[in-house]
A protein has these predicted regions:
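PLP-dependent amino-acid enzyme catalytic core
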Residues: 1-436
Length: 436
């Protein structure tokens, strides 16, 4: 399958080219030339299938023509070495827990898949030239990518993160690894980090000296595999007879997660409605209300992984719907959750239902409560990170202690190593060239 740019100014690329390049030469995001439709027999039969079987079927629809089935199966099985269970919170609302991977965040799925697919292409090329992965993080992406790519031959990873704007636990997950992982502590906000990464891809001098790619959700090998757990969630709900009229609430920052859900829906997954759950960075909610996309500087919130003022994947959503605002608003609504509402939601869900979300999951739950569920509807919110990653916020809001998983404790015992970085592209470019 070929992959075209959302800016439509360059020729379509092969899967390998799209994965290795990350961003198209015209600064657009790659999209599959066609979105395969999965037949109803598969959808109805998923409740009898394992997560691996479901994911392999979905992966084959996109990637099956570009790599041997045996290699794709290995990548899927290596990626999904953990489950993504659906857990009841109330009689009508369920949590899709995406934090059971190595770094306790949903991004483990996409990051591990991309690391293995990129490694496959590098090995197939027999390339002697090292591939440099650039990734901007507002929280969980950095840890998921760093751990997914750790010690993968032929790959170096540079994680750009905003100084003082990720939690201490998140920071230690990518600043303590060393080896082929370098953390760059940028004096700015996430949008500055993302702008540096995008600028690097279109800089002729850098690309002449370094093979660059991205592991943010702008990379097709990062965001497309996130469709796997939407199908798996539906299968789990179908097993208990609750799959009809699903309303799925997606905590949204850079919108890769929501885009993956929309791709799954276009492939035939019967979701009735999506909610884009925003924090105070609500440019998408503004777009839904006005039809105008007006990016603005991000503001810091308790749900820091969603602190994005110019989400990259908006381009993919717009492209997916052909720019049809009415079609977008028919399927997707939005919500806005303030820090005060995050704290109140955390306290209420723990006290009333005995379930502990993280601040991002709290936004997803709050969005469902804001919209309300009609008779016959069932709500599912994506619980994107383990609450222990936001210990101070969760414990202060709920008045209860959160147990820290052992694998998270191991990260916390490491020594921080990071490189201070100005937010200017000149400083970033000079640093990368010094590493060539």
């Amino acid at each position: 399958m070929k992959y075209y740019s959302t800016n439509h100014q360059v020729s379509p690329a092969s899967l390998e080219e799209a994965v290795v390049r990350g961003l198209a030469a015209d600064r657009g995001l790659f999209m599959p030339e066609r979105i395969p439709t999965l037949d109803r027999a598969f959808i109805d039969g998923m409740k009898h299938m394992t997560f691996h079987e479901i994911a392999l079927h979905v992966a084959s629809a996109f990637f099956g023509d570009d790599m041997p089935q045996s290699d794709l199966r290995r990548i899927v099985e290596d990626t999904l070495a953990f489950d993504t269970p659906v857990v009841p919170v109330t009689d009508t609302i369920y949590s899709l827990e995406l934090f059971h991977g190595p770094t306790l965040a949903f991004k483990d799925v996409g990051a591990r898949f991309m690391a293995r697919m990129l490694g496959h292409f590098i090995a197939r090329r027999g390339a002697s030239r090292e591939v440099n992965v650039l990734v901007a993080t507002s929280g969980d992406t950095g840890s998921a990518v760093a751990n997914g790519f750790l010690d993968v031959p032929g790959i170096r990873v540079f994680v750009l993160y905003p100084k003082g704007k990720v939690s201490a636990i998140q920071e230690c997950q990518f600043t303590t690894l060393g080896r082929n992982i370098t953390a760059l502590e940028v004096d700015g906000v996430f949008d500055d980090c993302q702008a540096l990464v995008k600028s690097a891809f279109v800089d002729a001098d850098l690309n002449a000296h370094l093979q660059l790619t991205s592991a943010n959700s702008i990379n097709v090998a990062r965001f497309l595999p996130q469709a796997f757990y939407y199908f798996h969630a539906y299968a789990q709900m179908d097993r208990i007879g609750r799959a009809q009229r699903l309303v799925v609430s997606v905590p949204s920052g850079n919108f890769g997660n929501l885009t993956a859900g929309l791709i799954a829906h276009r492939m035939g997954l019967p979701v009735s409605h999506f909610i884009a759950a925003n924090n105070r960075n609500d440019v998408f909610l503004d777009y839904l209300h006005t039809g105008l996309y007006r990016p603005r500087p991000s503001v810091a919130t308790l749900a820091n992984a969603m602190d994005v003022g110019d989400p990259s994947n908006f381009a993919r959503i717009l492209d997916l719907f052909g720019g049809d605002h009415a079609a977008i608003t028919a399927l997707i609504s939005g919500s806005r959750t303030t820090d005060e509402e995050i704290r109140a939601t955390l306290a209420d869900v723990v006290r009333t239902h005995g379930y502990t979300p993280d601040p991002h999951g709290a936004c997803g739950y709050h969005a469902l409560m804001q919209r309300g569920l009609q008779p016959g509807e069932t709500g599912v919110f994506l619980e994107t990170a383990h609450p222990a990653k936001f210990l101070d916020t969760v414990e202060t809001a709920t008045g209860r202690s959160v147990e820290i998983p052992e694998r998270l404790r191991a990260f916390m015992q490491g020594e921080k190593r990071s490189v201070p970085m100005a937010r200017t592209f000149e400083a970033f470019k000079d640093y990368l060239l010094s590493q060539a």
